[in-house]
A protein has these predicted regions:
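An active-site-proximal structural segment forming one wall of the substrate-binding cleft
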Residues: 451, 455-458
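Substrate-binding groove/exosite segments of carbohydrate-active enzymes
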Residues: 47-51, 59, 281-443
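Beta-sandwich/jelly-roll carbohydrate-recognition scaffolds of carbohydrate-active enzymes
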Residues: 21-304
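Conserved functional hotspot residues or short segments at active or partner-binding sites
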Residues: 448
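Conserved small/polar residues in nucleotide/adenosyl-binding loops
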Residues: 498-504
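Short, surface-exposed recognition loops and adjoining beta-strand edges that mediate ligand/DNA contacts
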Residues: 328-343, 460-477
Length: 504
């Protein structure tokens, strides 16, 4: 146990140990007090509900007649020949239930409840036109997003009314300059999305100039549908209203990082989910999240702070299980097409998502972060050579996950050397809390060693004062000078690197 800001943190190997503890017992429904509950629909996308499985996810929000999802995936990075590496959205799904089921003017009752414990969202509404229920979750074990829709329509059904499920991708500029600059060519980032159908599925295929391609597949179960091609970039499934409407929507997303044939694999994911049955899929989904929550328990005297702790843990479990680290600037939760400020990752901000994960026994969520930076060792070593050292590596503050050192020549960052050592610190925390010596030896230590070697080669000896010093250097975003001596940030990180023992 550690006392951290009045928090009692107790780590256990599994839930059985918790229940057997003589200290206290945790109610099976303890986490329900941290459910996110709306008693009226939220039409602003940025106030929607986050759902994800660590790789696939996005926000869900309301329209007067249904719901909208922006579908995102952690590895959809476009790498154009001339331009920055940019994380693209996959697309959007719109579900229109045919009547104003969420209109403020017509609501008699409403509740939307995001269960952190089960990683699912349940929505209920009642209007003079219909009583509706929607349940949505992203399978923890496969890239399949499930939306279960039910509607009991009242009195006379509106003539010609239909349920419409639409899949689209329009794309956009990323506006990565944080309002200070923007690409005036609004066609950049649109991609070449095309929709088609294969049997009863809508297939949306996208390919970017940098080589990324991906597929979204959408299937509706339990009700007959007609597929209508709206445009090159949008298709809809239409089903006439009946007094009692029940159907399930399945969405899968596969990228060229996952498969050489994303379309075939996306369809295969839906086939496997259907054969397994959604009941069995959901049981395994709940089992994964039960295990996730059982790995640690936190109680805080301040309920509001405890809410923040658990929603943050939920968000990391929902977004840090893919190929790359969670982007600090929106994660999987962006909603405005491809708009994402600071498109280039800044480590100063990225690291904050990973602070404390090892302590709370979520070391597995550190793996995308660790392995992304280990893959950047060759580029890091090349940059250190340019800075004049024989050995070692450097990671610039602003970079992309392909290893492009974006800020290598920025005046306010050019002699900031600390990101690699900060990365090393988080890597060391993984080992400290797992004691995985093989992973330390084969993955973590090679990076840490090179980060330490840079300082060993770069430090200079002062014959007069009989001490080492570092020059030129600068702290983060130091606009005034890149030629400072003995910056405190470097001194601190040097101490950290050289007090971490090496594997035997």
């Amino acid at each position: 146990m550690k006392n951290i800001v009045s928090a009692l943190i107790v780590l256990f190997c599994n839930v059985c140990v918790i229940q057997a503890s003589s200290l206290f017992k945790i109610d099976d429904n303890y986490l329900s007090q941290h459910d996110i509950v709306y008693l009226e629909p939220e039409f602003d996308s940025f106030n929607g509900f986050p759902l994800g499985n660590g790789d696939l996810g996005g926000m869900l929000w309301f329209t007067n007649e249904g719901i909208t999802l922006q579908i995102n995936k952690i590895d959809l990075y476009d790498k154009p020949a001339n331009g920055r590496m940019t994380l693209r959205s996959a697309g959007r799904l719109n579900v229109n239930l045919g009547v104003p089921c969420y209109s403020y003017m017509h609501l008699a009752d409403f509740e939307a409840r995001l269960s952190l414990q089960n990683a699912d969202l349940k929505i209920k509404s009642s209007t003079p036109f219909a009583d509706t229920e929607i349940t949505s979750w992203v399978d923890a074990n496969s890239n399949v997003w499930v939306i279960d829709c039910q509607a009991d329509y009242k009195k006379t059904l509106p003539s010609g009314a239909v349920n419409r499920i639409s899949l689209e991708r329009w794309g956009s500029c990323d506006f990565g300059g944080w309002y200070g600059s923007r690409d005036r060519d609004v066609a950049n980032g649109l991609g070449t999305a095309k929709v088609n159908r294969q049997e009863n599925d809508i297939i949306l295929e996208e390919k970017f100039e940098g080589g990324l391609h991906f597929t979204i597949a959408c299937r509706v179960l339990k009700t007959p549908t007609e597929i209508l091609r709206v445009s090159d970039r949008e298709s809809s499934m239409i089903t006439p209203l009946s007094s009692k409407q029940k159907y399930k929507i399945l969405i899968s997303v596969v990228s060229s990082n996952d498969s050489d044939n994303p379309t075939q694999e996306a369809i295969s994911l839906l086939d496997k989910a259907e054969v397994k049955t959604l009941t069995a899929l959901r049981k395994e989904h709940l089992s994964w999240w039960t295990h996730f929550w059982s790995k640690s328990f936190v109680h805080l005297a301040d309920n509001y702070l405890e809410n923040i702790y658990y929603i943050r843990r939920y968000l990391m479990g929902s977004s840090s299980r893919g190929k790359y680290p969670v982007p600090f600037n929106g994660g999987l939760w962006t909603t405005n097409y491809d708009h994402r400020q600071w498109a280039t990752p800044h480590h100063w901000n990225t690291q904050e998502s990973y602070w404390g994960l090892a302590v709370q026994n979520d070391c597995d969520l550190l793996r995308p972060y660790i392995e992304t930076y280990v893959n950047m060792i060759p580029q890091g070593k090349a940059l250190a050579r340019k800075k004049g050292t024989k050995d070692g590596l450097l990671i610039t503050e602003a970079h992309d996950f392909s290893g492009n050192m974006v800020s290598a020549n920025w005046g306010n960052m050019t002699t900031n050397y600390t990101p690699a050592s900060q990365i090393s610190k988080i890597m060391w925390e993984y080992y400290a809390y797992t004691q995985d010596r093989d992973y330390l030896r084969n993955t973590i230590y090679p990076f840490m060693k090179e980060a330490a070697e840079f300082y060993l080669n770069f430090l200079q000896w002062d014959d007069v004062r009989k001490e080492f010093y570092i020059y030129p250097a600068q702290p983060y975003e130091h606009e005034w000078s890149s030629k400072l001596k003995n910056t405190i940030t470097d001194r601190y990180m040097i101490c950290l690197l050289y007090t971490s023992p090496s594997p035997r």
